[in-house]
């Protein structure tokens, strides 16, 4: 439905939306005569096409359903490690010590909730249809199996299963910046983390320094893989915006995932 007419120095970069990634739907944006997925080259003028690949759940989409999002970049706004360290000194990007090496490291929380021990969810196979446009509509226990910590602080990822987990750190994105999860690094492990890698300006900010935890979409590859509590699973790259947005991520936008802990997508009924 959409088309682009970009200035000569501005390119587009797409990702699945958070609610799309959290139901294990993988999307890729394609351009006319494009050589890469999810990228519109600077100056691109033409249509956009969307490849939609549900992995676990059958989904219902219709004309106008919003599955992906796009950002526009001019030049190279990504910060170096030195710039990220300076930004962290000005406004804490995570609670506790910041591990900055090729971006800001995020690690996995497998200790779980202090009261319940809940550490995440595993998607159930052969569950019902998900209408991507319906919010707070589905009983979570029909689609997800809760996973608890039984004292080992670890989790074995089964091959080709899909998990929702959370970062140990709480993250803040200053209003002047956005962030993106670095694409899968094979040195981290034999699994994929985070289909929807965009963190909007204001995410986790203004919450009395507490931030919001990153909810992670995790899929193992062909072999079982053991995750340990505190293991690094990805890194955030921060990018400076051309201007501060008039409206930030949060209450004013009715954002679904501000102040989030471990949270499923907006399609499910949650307490």
Spans of model-derived segments:
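DUTPase catalytic domain/fold
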Residues: 1-271
């Amino acid at each position: 439905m959409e088309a682009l007419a970009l200035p000569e120095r501005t390119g587009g970069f797409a990702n699945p939306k958070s609610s799309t990634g959290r139901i294990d739907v993988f999307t890729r944006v394609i351009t006319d005569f494009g050589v890469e997925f999810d990228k519109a080259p600077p100056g691109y003028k033409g249509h956009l096409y969307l490849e939609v690949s549900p992995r676990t759940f059958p989904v219902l989409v219709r004309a106008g359903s919003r599955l992906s999002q796009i950002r526009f970049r001019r030049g190279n706004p990504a910060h170096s490690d030195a710039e990220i360290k300076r930004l962290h000194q000005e406004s804490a990007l995570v609670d506790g010590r910041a591990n900055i090496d090729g971006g800001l490291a995020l690690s996995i929380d497998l200790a779980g909730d202090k009261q319940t021990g809940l550490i995440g969810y595993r998607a159930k196979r052969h569950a019902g249809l998900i209408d991507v446009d319906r919010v707070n509509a589905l009983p979570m226990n029909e689609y997800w199996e809760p996973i608890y910590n039984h004292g080992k602080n670890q989790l074995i990822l089964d091959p080709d299963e899909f998990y929702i987990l959370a970062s140990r750190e709480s993250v803040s994105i200053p209003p002047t910046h956005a962030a993106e999860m670095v694409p899968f690094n094979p040195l981290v492990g034999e699994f994929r983390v985070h289909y929807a890698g965009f963190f909007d300006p204001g995410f986790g900010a203004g919450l009395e320094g507490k931030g919001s935890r990153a909810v992670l979409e995790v899929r193992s590859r062909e072999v079982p893989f053991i995750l340990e509590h505190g293991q690094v699973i990805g890194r955030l790259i921060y990018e400076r915006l051309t201007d501060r947005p008039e409206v930030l991520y949060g209450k004013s936008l009715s954002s679904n995932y501000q102040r989030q802990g471990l949270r499923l997508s907006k399609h499910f009924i949650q307490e």
